[in-house]
């Protein structure tokens, strides 16, 4: 979580929303998850300590307003691409793929290696359905 906050802090420092000066579907999709972390004492403490721009974004999203345009990808990529690569490419997609394979195989539980550590859990149907929609 601290790593995600750090990457998001680097991206939101100096911009109002994920893609520039107006909220996007991405902001609304991510906001709910981060808001819930902010109001929980443990992840909220990490967020307040390491992510003042992220906290400001969460608060801004309570009453979002467009104040300008979306930025070009060239301006966004240096800080947004590392966040997306790390959180989605390195962690979420490998987990999601292992989950889907476990469901197809009828497995009670499955293991997936993430960041050199083994994660074990029961497969969940909703995430497999979501993966199928984007795959």
What feature does the model see in each segment?
Residues 1-59, 63-67, 72-135:
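GST-like fold's C-terminal all-alpha helical module
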């Amino acid at each position: 979580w601290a790593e995600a906050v750090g990457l998001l802090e680097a991206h939101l420092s100096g911009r109002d929303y994920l893609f520039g000066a107006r909220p996007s579907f991405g902001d609304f999709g991510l906001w709910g998850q981060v808001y819930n972390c902010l109001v929980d004492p443990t992840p909220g403490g990490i967020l307040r300590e390491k992510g003042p721009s992220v906290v400001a974004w969460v608060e801004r999203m309570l009453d979002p307003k467009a104040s300008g345009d979306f930025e070009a990808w060239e301006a966004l990529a240096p800080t947004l691409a590392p966040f997306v690569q790390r959180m989605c490419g390195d962690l979420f997609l490998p987990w999601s793929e292992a989950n889907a394979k476990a469901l197809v195989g009828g497995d009670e539980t499955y293991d997936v290696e993430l960041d050199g550590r083994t994660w074990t859990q029961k497969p969940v149907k909703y995430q497999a359905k979501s993966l199928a929609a984007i795959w």
